[in-house]
Amino acid sequence: MFTGKTFIALALSALLPAASALAAGDDTLVYCSEASPESFNPQIASSGPSFVASSQVLYNRLINFDPVKNTPVPSLATEWNVSPDGKTWTFTLRKGVQFNSNKFFKPTRDFNADDVLFSVLRQKDANHPYHNVSHGQYEYFHDVGLDKLIKEVKKIDDYHVQFVLNEPNAAFLADWGMDFASILSAEYADAMLKKGTPEYIDTWPVGTGPYALQQYKVDSLIRYVANPHYWDGEVPTKHLIFSITPNVETRLAKLQTNECQIIPAPSPVQFPVIKGNKDLALHSVEALNVGYLAFNTEKKPFDNLLVRQALNYATDKQAIVKAVFLESGSVAKSPIPANMLGYKKDLPDYDYDPQKAKDLLKQAGLEKGAEVTLWSMPVQRPYNPNSRRIAEMIQNDWSKVGIKAKIVTYEWGEYLAGMRKGEHDSALFGWMSDNGDPDNFAGTLLSCDNIKTGSNVARWCDKPYDSLVKRAILVSDPQERAKLYAQAQEIFYQQAPWITLATGKTFYATRSNVSGYSVSLMGSDFSKVKLN
């Protein structure tokens, strides 16, 4: 995480125009970001805005994802192969890839296998000299199980690395396209360690990506300059500015006045305004996500299955989607998105039935009701474009069956930290796919192991469910995996650790003269943007 000292150092690092001077020319693009980054190292970050500001601008990974097919394609690795037993993966690395430089460091060599080993071992090895730098928790690395899965990572030569696994894993390749798998410079890390400033690799990042960090003013702006040696072709827009704008209405106002040229996650109620302005354009992409309310199953009354089932029946999901999502979403019934491998189409759902909810609550001994807290997210997401409104509608639904829900919210970082610790009774949350694999939902969000890491917000541990998802990740055959996930979803439905609410399309808006910007599993790609 950043410190006050770090913020000051970054803010005073460059004699550049003031934050208000964001006029864009043909070589400057302004993006209205939703929030300040937690860190410029995606290995130790966990929020979407942090990943957009770091991994998707400053770094690359071994693989990328095809934006249409969502399948792995080469990036820093040009090819790969796996042994017949599925336990040994060998990657061939791209030659001629240069790292950026900054005022503390100028690289003397190109990207090679040493950088891959450093980026992996920092996260895996508790005795690595960088493991505890910046208080790194490496949440994603642990959530996908790489700390236990990887037995050994070896440098064969400068342009070949080999991973030896403890067991086969169907999602292993896709994991190396995730944000946390960004490749950092081992040479830079060594230099900063010798100078006694190891934290600089996280606050003054050096990567192989399309842009380099130039300036950061906390809660105000981030300035980047194009990488003149970018391996994937010339970057058309030389200057990129993130204008940090948490308020969704302010973001639209800035887009209308050309103070920024791209905004993420406009509210559905803003769609008519955007569509009605010839200078603006509204864009959408199909997304792999799910929004949900998680019951803390370790706390009363949600440790009682009857209560969880009752409140599923008490919640009018159709009304929520109609009122809040408008054209941007559809009702969800599974933890796995509908357009993903393993989704069970015939999975039943809880229909809106307040009387059935009352009957179940009576069986649970709560005929007189109960009081609980309902945490509401402070940010907008495709799977939850207006958390406060959704929370209020759920609060109203529950009140009809005798459950009084007190809505609370916190700053985003505090919200995430509190959920990881299990401080909530119930909480609105959601997930967007990191790698296109069903384990990223069924395992990451609901496995017993991930109660400890914090991504299992329901803190639900069901041994039969857990066994099924652990078996599924070992299987390479898609049909066999789908059967296992179908069985797991049946248990999920019966045990009701969540109220699955909705899946939402990813929307963003631009000035009409913007071209080349894309959004995919990898997030935002600024490397081809042009201002026409």
Report the location of each language-model feature.
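N-terminal lobe/hinge region of extracytoplasmic solute-binding protein
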Residues: C32-P84, L121, H128, V206-T208
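Structural transition elements
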Residues: Y211, V331-A364, R381-R389
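A structural "hinge/loop" feature
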Residues: A35-V52, L76-A77, K103-P107, F172-S182, ...
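A bilobed periplasmic-binding-protein/Venus flytrap-type ligand-binding module shared by bacterial periplasmic
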Residues: V225-P228, V285-A310, A314
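Detector for C-terminal structural segments
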Residues: D26-L29, A53, A170, K217, ...
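Aromatic- and charge-enriched surface segment that lines or borders ligand/interaction sites
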Residues: T78-P129, Q162, K254, P301
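Surface-exposed binding/hinge segments that line
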Residues: T92, K124-D125, P129-A189
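Ligand-site clamp/hinge motif
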Residues: E199-D202, N227-V273, S284, A391
